[in-house]
Amino acid sequence: KGQVEDFGVSPSGERLLVTARGDVFTVPVEHGVTRNLTQRGDAHDREAAWSPDGERIAFISDRSGEEQVYVIDDKGGESRALTDFGALRLYRPVWSPASDAIAVHDHMGRIHVVDLDGDVTEVFASEYGAITDYQWAPDSKWMAFTVQTDAGTGAIRLWSRDSGRLIEATDGAFNANSPAFSADGKHLYFLSDREFAPQIGAFEWNYVADRETGIFALALNDDAGNPFGPRNDEVEAAGEGDDNGKQDKDGNADEKKTVDVRVDAKGLGERLIRVVEHNRQDIASLPAAHSAL
């Protein structure tokens, strides 16, 4: 009672998105009014997510008797059900960057992609329980997620929204998780347990392996290269590349580049990149920002 269930931030950072008492609210960071978007006392509305374009909010609700994915305008109004699932428990709606689809997983180990027109695609079904670790590519055409293998390790899979193709990004020989696409769509970063340097405890004389996790990347295509390779900075003569010699410093700097993710499945596992030397730590997750991890 009186507890905030979960929360998020609007794309502009000006309002908070909060679920509490079974309803969905938006709250101003500084000035304005608090809006109760759903205003229902007969349902449990939860796990709300703001679309990247800021126009809609997705949430999960049991108002129909079973949990479904709903969307509502960010200013309020009538909500709309996008799904017609049976008896399922749904979790973690994640918008595509293009704001045209929502990924969600259920308690049966399945990932679904729900388009705004109501089309639902089952991406993957795991026999080992819920898949909670999934991320969209910046072009909204690919998704990366972690599955459990027969050996009990985590392995990363890639799914093409256009073709439905599944690609094995890591084979499960080493535990891998927390996939995150680079902003330019050329690399897939992830965490993996690949180095084991056990230490002896000072008092109990037991071996402890606590620094096995490192940050790695896969070059998604043959042209992606290694972003952490040796650099060779050169001086560019004035006038090269642009009439005023400021191609990257003037108007072009603010233009958004179109990202088109290309995945070459052949040899993907061989294009493995160690992000930072001696970076083994107890790392739990790997979120990606525009130009940083």
Where are these regions (language model features)?
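Multi-bladed beta-propeller domains
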Residues: K1-Q3, P28-R46, S61, I72-Y91, ...
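Structural motif
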Residues: F25, E66-Y70, R110-H112, G152-I156, ...
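Hydrophobic beta-strand positions that form the internal "hydrophobic ladder"
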Residues: L16, I57, S99-I102, S140-M143, ...
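Conserved beta-strand position repeated across blades of beta-propeller domains
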Residues: G8, A49, V94, Q135, ...
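Loop/turn-rich, solvent-exposed surfaces of beta-rich toroidal or solenoidal domains
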Residues: W136-A137, K141-G154, P287-L293
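Residue-level detector of Asp-centered blade-edge/turn motifs that repeat once per structural unit
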Residues: P11-S12, P52-D53, P97-A98, P138-D139, ...
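Structural signature of WD-repeat beta-propellers
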Residues: T19-A20, S64, D106
